[in-house]
Amino acid sequence: MYVVPPPQRSDSGSNGDLRVYQTWKGSNIFFLQGRFVFGPDVRSLALTICLIAVPVTIFCIFVARKLIDDFSDSWGVSIVAVAVVFTIYDLILLLLTSGRDPGIIPRNAHPPEPETLDGNMDAGAGQTPQLRLPRIKEVQLNGITFKVKYCDTCMLYRPPRCSHCSICNNCVERFDHHCPWVGQCIGMRNYRFFFMFVFSTTLLCIYVFAFCWVYIRKIMESEHTTTWKAMLKTPASIVLIIYTFISMWFVGGLTVFHLYLISTNQTTYENFRYRYDRRSNPHNKGVVNNFKETFFSTIPPSKNDFRAMVQREPPLPPRSVAGGFMSPNMGKANDEIEMGRKAVWADMGPAMSDHGDGKHGNNERLHVKDGELGELSPDIRATVDEQSDRPSMHPRRSSWGRKSGSWDMSPEVMALAARVGEQNQNGGGSSSGSGLVTENRPT
């Protein structure tokens, strides 16, 4: 009889253990052993950094450096210093937005227990109504009924204001949107940094735009020339003015839009998906309280410890039946018998070839080791013959109980198991070292 050894506890440093980020089922990309979590489109982050750093570098070299001599004392140096510090601050906010957990809800290993029956309650005598999870549940929030949906991927009911991101393949709390420019979902834990990043980028564009015009004005005053001629003397300023003007429309418009969302306590997803007014939005707490909730509330800790150790899932060992060993294909056939489905005999060919000839019909698909087991009893032979004469198509029947929550063997399988046990007791002296495996299908 093959006995599966009990699982052994392993230390955190054993080779059989992995960290959570190594077994993560989402589409996220991790850096520094799970300390930074990014979205699958993290490469776009490099483009965003270049769009910020390159214009500021051009500004410091060709514009701000020449303004140092035009301002007395330390005012000229401060122009360069402010631009550099502002850029570093902006990039830090970008990293805080892109490299942290946005509020991912850990997915369940198994679906929750079904609570209602789905299907016809007046099922036949040999059938049991199937248990199925309801797709939508209703919850109350501030006196308003919300419908929460079941997520098949994460196997959980998404709480209010939570949505599943198809890009990151995660359910995110207070999901706002997935931003390709930062390569990350925007949710409960990084929305504050996202808005600060967009707002600071807008201010940086205004800063560069303004001092480029200051430099052009200085050229006009020193050389007593027109605006167009002064602009031709500093092509870098012309490029930066055009670039920052276009950028201000994008990031500035995004800043104004999110100021509206914060004042009404909405998310981008809710604004496009639903239409709240001031009376029907259950999340609106007033302009002042909405801003306090966004910028001065405590950021909840992450629900995921990406650096925690998890044990590697061991492979399933072969199971034993009546003193012998059973291959995985044979186990699959037995599982299908227990579930009321037709056994897939074709998949058992390799396992049966070691014990007998696979060319015979279903009546002779019995595993006998070295011919030590005697002829089968008439009862078992009649049962096998009866099953083999049935047509190939059978309705699938589930033995899942209505309330028990467990799989039970059908009476036909129990009766057959009892007959096999009696046969083994009668022939135990001559077949102690052999294994008998017989396959049957419930009627």
Curated annotation (Swiss-Prot):
It is found in: Cell membrane. InterPro entries: Palmitoyltrfase_DHHC, PFA4/ZDH16/20/ERF2-like. Keywords: Acyltransferase, Cell membrane, Lipoprotein, Membrane, Palmitate, Phosphoprotein, Transferase, Transmembrane, Transmembrane helix. It catalyses: L-cysteinyl-[protein] + hexadecanoyl-CoA = S-hexadecanoyl-L-cysteinyl-[protein] + CoA. The DHHC domain is required for palmitoyltransferase activity. Residues 149-199 form the DHHC domain. It is an enzyme of class 2 (transferase). GO terms for molecular function: protein-cysteine S-palmitoyltransferase activity. Pfam families: DHHC (PF01529). Palmitoyl acyltransferase. The active site is at residue 179. GO terms for cellular component: cytosol; plasma membrane. The chain crosses the membrane at residues 44-64, 76-96, 193-213, 237-257. The modification Phosphoserine is found at residues 327, 377, 406. Its EC number is 2.3.1.225. This is Probable protein S-acyltransferase 7. Residues 382-392 have a biased composition (Basic and acidic residues). Residues 382-443 are annotated as: Disordered. Belongs to the DHHC palmitoyltransferase family. It is a multi-pass membrane protein.
